[in-house]
From Swiss-Prot:
Subcellular locations according to the entry: Cytoplasm; Golgi apparatus
Pfam family, one: Calpain_III
Protein source organism: Rattus norvegicus
Top-level taxonomic group: Eukaryota
Gene name of the record: Capn8
SMART domains linked to this entry: calpain_III, CysPc, EFh
Annotated cofactor note: Binds 2 calcium ions.
Listed name of the protein: Calpain-8
Length: 703
């Protein structure tokens, strides 16, 4: 209950702007300015109670309490390590990033790339902090997390051994921004050890809020040059590297002066006329050193003598120190991989940049309601969350060689918080997605999930290449204009997890979650609908309480269970007293806490309707229906509910084996009827909003 209320409160705050870089979420409720002011007023340096300087902050296994690797560690503030500590010395540069005894080189590479873009760097590293002015032992950083910016506050106590920083540190002995940044990121993820192993892309995204693509340059798409050209035009961050197969190859230099294992930045592409034919060139930068490419189109290569001198001068002006040109064909031969981090619109301020349009959805896979697994599981696949994208504007500049107008879309599916959950043994799930074109006759269908029949025999228009246990799977797709259904899923069904689905499009795309409608129109029976069996039930009622008397919850339980226990077409252990109280709550119009004869008749007819639905859904006649089938059962009973409500129902009414028995099924239906009835009575303006005082609210939920 508390988690649900917190979720609703969070959604409302986000709608009002919480989570932007200018209004970041306060991680764990800690506010930097408030805490710093308290410390300055009291004259005491900040000690972070949420991430204390103790073994639990280091890790849980290899760096856990009692591990030999953690013996002799002392937490010290920079003021205890050197006489004149500085936050930043001469600007943040790649030389400030030196790896320590933690396997987080993926994070360090991302930080190094971030130093090349000052605007993006200072979104992560607020400037309002130092070891001189208003120093109170407290620092703060901002990271993008699953659709929102989060401000993380830390104290400046850092793990040391023999007077030296244990983990990330700067070449400058008195500079500490990089070590403090690593600590803040460790806090966000639960511990330093949680940072071991990862992808540079993960760091890129958490520092920028962008969406990343990866290309294997041994198998490049035909239009890769065009993709790079457009990415640069949109202000994206591009990095490339040469794979190393052994540790000995790291830092090795190729015959033509390229360094293996280093991350190079891609900074430009141009086309020149060379010997009467077009030659594609690409400009790179090595932020790690002075070594530069010595092959064709390098600084003093002879190829430059065979192009227009004015064009040569123009390209010379575009290349800064540390940058060099090479042919695109050589680029594909020499490098192994290319990573593109496409920035979200709020990361880009220049009006000249062609920005992406972004739509973001947060969702959840819940066992028994929305965790349907992949297409290998057709019985549950359709229960996964479903999202509709409407693409009606084609790209302005279509690719060469394409005849049909298309819409370019970047899809990214990211699972949430798995790194933080490593300490409890929850690793990455295998995730992926499929995209289906919606036929014309279903384009207006938005109020409920597309069912099992829609997916049977239907092939996706495109899908993620494979299910992978990565934090994010993403791909660039080109689709004809139309409406599309995106289905994100885990590989196996019944796997709980939170996710974030992002859609970056060249042109503005309309998008919505399918089945976000909530409505309830349950069948209202009439006592004249009673048949022979119903007359028997009525006579039993009169036998228990008399013709004109009212029946209590305990008596109701005895009557209903006696009738239903005689049925041979179902397995049923009986209604419990709480379900019977729910029944009385729904139909007790005069507030006596009991049911009269007419109210009892109405109740029995409702139960009979629910029994018909239950037996239809109990395919194996075992006395339970599978929790994921509740969506269909609820629809048959007149309820259309969104994923959030479906997930709540699964948590409330399904047993550990994800089955719902008849008692739970009826309790759910009766409860829903009661809640819809209450809301309609209170929604006087019929605008879908009810305002209640605290006392009124308590009376309603306690009914």
């Amino acid at each position: 209950m508390a988690a649900l209320a917190a979720g609703v409160s969070k959604q409302r705050a986000v709608a009002e702007g919480l989570g932007s870089n200018q209004n970041a979420v306060k991680y764990l409720g800690q506010d930097f300015e408030t805490l710093r002011k308290q410390c300055l007023n009291s004259g005491v340096l900040f000690k972070d109670p949420e991430f204390p300087a103790c073994p639990s902050a280091l890790g849980y296994k290899d760096l856990g309490p009692g591990s030999p690797d953690t013996q002799g560690i002392v937490w010290k503030r920079p003021t205890e390590l050197c006489p004149n500590p500085q936050f930043i010395v001469g600007g943040a540069t790649r030389t400030d990033i030196r790896q320590g005894g933690l396997g987080d080189c993926w994070l360090l590479a991302a930080i190094a790339s971030l130093t090349l873009n000052e605007k993006l760097l200072y979104r992560v590293l607020p400037r309002d902090q130092s070891f001189q002015k208003d120093y109170a032992g407290i620092f703060h950083f901002q990271f993008w997390q699953y659709g929102e910016w989060v401000e993380v506050v830390i104290d400046d106590r850092l793990p040391t051994k023999n007077g030296q920083l244990l983990f990330l540190h700067s070449e400058e002995g008195n500079e500490f921004w990089s070590a403090l940044l690593e600590k803040a990121y460790a806090k966000l993820n639960g511990s330093y050890e949680a940072l071991v192993g990862g992808s540079t892309i993960e760091g890129f995204e958490d520092f920028t809020g962008g969406i990343s693509e990866f290309y294997d340059l041994k198998k490049p798409p035909e239009n890769l040059y065009y993709i790079i050209q457009k990415a640069l035009r949109k202000g994206s961050l591009l990095g490339c590297s040469i794979d190393v197969s052994t540790a000995a190859e790291a830092e090795a230099t190729t015959r033509q002066k390229l360094v293996k294992g280093h991350a190079y930045s891609v900074t430009g592409v141009e086309e020149v006329n060379f010997h009467g034919r077009p030659e594609k060139l690409i400009r790179l930068r090595n932020p790690w050193g002075e070594v530069e490419w010595s092959g064709a189109w390098s600084d003093n290569a002879p190829e430059w003598n065979y192009i227009d001198p004015r064009r040569k001068e123009e390209l010379d002006k575009k290349a800064e120190d540390g940058e060099f040109w090479m042919s695109f064909s050589d680029f594909l031969k020499q490098y192994s991989r290319l990573e593109i981090c496409n920035l979200s619109p709020d990361s880009l301020s220049s009006e000249e940049i062609h920005k992406w349009n972004l739509v973001l959805f947060n969702g959840r896979w819940t066992r028994g309601s929305t965790a349907g697994g992949c297409l290998n599981y057709p019985g549950t696949y359709w229960t996964n969350p479903q999202f509709k994208i409407h693409l009606d504007e084609v790209d302005e500049d279509q690719e060469e060689g394409t005849s049909e107008p298309c819409c370019t879309v970047l899809l990214g599916l990211m699972q949430k918080n798995r790194r933080r959950q490593k300490r409890i043994g929850q690793g990455m799930l295998s995730i992926g997605y499929a995209v289906y074109q919606i036929p014309k006759e279903l384009e207006s269908h938005t109020d409920a999930h597309l069912g099992r029949d829609f997916f049977l025999g239907r092939q996706p228009s495109t899908c993620s290449s494979t299910y992978m246990n990565l934090r994010e799977v993403s791909s660039r797709v080109r689709l004809p204009p139309g409406q599309y259904l995106v289905v994100p899923s885990t590989f196996e069904p019944f796997k709980d997890g939170d996710f974030c689905l992002r859609v970056f499009s060249e042109k503005k795309a309309k998008a919505l979650e399918i089945g976000d409608t909530v409505s309830g129109h349950p069948h209202e029976p009439h006592p004249r609908d009673m048949d022979e069996e119903d007359e028997h039930v009525r006579s039993l009622f009169e036998e228990f309480v008399g013709k004109d008397s009212e029946i209590s919850a305990n008596q109701l339980k005895r009557v209903l269970n006696e009738v239903l226990s005689k049925r041979t077409d179902m397995k049923f252990d009986g209604f419990n007293i709480n379900t019977c109280r729910e029944m009385i709550s729904l139909l007790d119009s005069d507030g006596t806490g009991s049911l009269g004869p007419m109210e009892f008749k109405t109740l029995w007819l409702k139960i009979r309707t629910y029994l018909e639905i239950f037996q239809e859904m109990d395919h194996n006649h075992v006395g339970t229906i599978e929790a994921h089938e509740m969506r269909t059962a609820l629809k048959k009973a007149g309820f259309t509910l969104n994923n959030q409500v479906q997930q709540t129902i699964a948590m409330r009414y399904a047993c550990s084996k994800l089955g719902v028995d008849f008692n739970g099924f009826v309790a759910c239906m009766i409860r829903l009827e009661t809640l819809f009835k209450l809301f309609r009575l209170l929604d006087k303006d019929q605008n879908g909003i009810v305002q209640l005082s605290l006392a009124e609210w308590l009376c309603c939920v306690l009914v």
